């Protein structure tokens, strides 16, 4: 649950199909603020009517992110960060008895969401990855977010760990 528009919609769509969900959020203080974490908690609350009771795991991600930033070429930063997140999510999911990971990715919405990039992040762990938004465009996702009541919270301007170190 990143704090953006897509992940709550992905959770909603999977809950609609009967999937029980836990959420994982990656926080990178001091680069991400307490307000950003509160935003994610608010989003988790807003989708509770659809998902039922869930756990929210907040993963401190500053050190891995700094390590990748300091040691990887800029061109690989995003894919290496996503692979690292997938590995961590896999560990948490297995400990919780989860059978799959769910992401809010949609194909080719951003450069890290090409088929090749998705294959690369998938290969970092061994659970099935469900992507309920894969064929949706941003307008369709925003329409669902508005309908389920998450859009206004999702667009609050707090930083998330996926963008704070993105190479310029």
What are these regions (language model features)?
Residues 65, 71-143, 147-148:
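Active-site adenylate/phosphate-handling loop in enzymes that bind or generate adenylated species
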Residues 149-157:
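A short alpha-helix-loop-beta-strand transition element characteristic
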Residues 9, 35-42, 59, 76, ...:
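Conserved active-site and cofactor/substrate-binding residues in soluble primary-metabolism enzymes
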